[in-house]
UniProtKB/Swiss-Prot annotation:
EC number, UniProt record: 3.6.1.1
Subcellular location: Cytoplasm
Record-linked InterPro entries: DDH_dom, DHH_sf, DHHA2, DHHA2_dom_sf, Mn-dep_inorganic_PyrPase, Oligoribo/pAp-PDE_c-di-AMP_PDE
SMART domains on file: DHHA2 (SM01131)
Pfam families linked: DHH (PF01368), DHHA2 (PF02833)
Keyword Isomerase in annotation: no
Entry keyword annotation includes Isomerase: no
Protein name stated in the entry: Probable manganese-dependent inorganic pyrophosphatase
Cofactor section: Mn(2+)
Cofactor binding comment, as recorded: Binds 2 manganese ions per subunit.
Reactions catalysed, as given in the entry: diphosphate + H2O = 2 phosphate + H(+)
Family stated for the protein in its record: Belongs to the PPase class C family.
Main localisation: cytoplasm
Primary gene name: ppaC
Amino acid sequence: MSKFLVFGHRNPDTDAIASSYGWAHLEREVFGRDAEAVVLGTPNEETAFALDYFGVTAPRVVESAKAEGVSQVILTDHNEFQQSIADIKEVEVAAVIDHHRVANFETANPLYMRLEPVGSASSIVYRAFKENGVIPPKEVAGLLLSGLISDTLLLKSPTTHVTDPQVAAELAEIAGVNLEEYGLALLKAGTNLASKSAEELIDIDAKTFGLNGNDVRVAQVNTVDIAEVLERQAEIEAAMTAASVANGYSDFVLMITDIVNSNSEILALGSNMDKVEAAFNFKLENNHAFLAGAVSRKKQVVPQLTDAFNA
């Protein structure tokens, strides 16, 4: 039996790592297949907090599937090829477990594809456990809960699905944690930005989207003080520009999200700033503007950018 690698997107966030870890466990223990969860980048501080809290060793970082001797992979928390492993087009995608839009994706063979408009890929993985009559181990439940908390900002994001609060409650019970207390501690762990270089900061949680022939980089950082992040605007802009030149991004959009007040400041650079302004009906001043109530890249930024770039 061939081995499957299971992984989330590049620049992995907590949900990317948690969902792949949980699905790999399901593959091994329920479906009887050889599967290993790996990651496409070093876990961020929020994810490191969750891994440490539940006593889980961080999965291996890999850069190539073929170099690992596998021919089949399973994707969680993403489907767009430019967000995946470098040689994604050279291996077979056996399954996708995701909660995002489908774009820039095609396969030569049929596959198992499970897409649901829920708050996290971890929510889908937990649902699969329940459907198979299996209670996930405490550490798996803890990671899946962490993925859901992270992606929905403790169920406050507009991406939160009506079923997510119940999922969170059940996972918290299995994991043996208080949902609110653990959730706040997890999110707080992800707001420590002072120790990061500008290059690290813009790469904590970043994805590239193909928008009408443009490669648009959309990154997000969580904070409790937007002004503190903007004090570093010059060096952050320099890092954004350098990344755009090195990788061919037409535009770089950074969401600086206040997780306490549920707002974001948008810092943007590139050749299509008119489209960025049209997307959010605001005017950039000194390359940034306030976006009230925006906390979700998936629901409140990417669809609006997509419409504006296609207009």
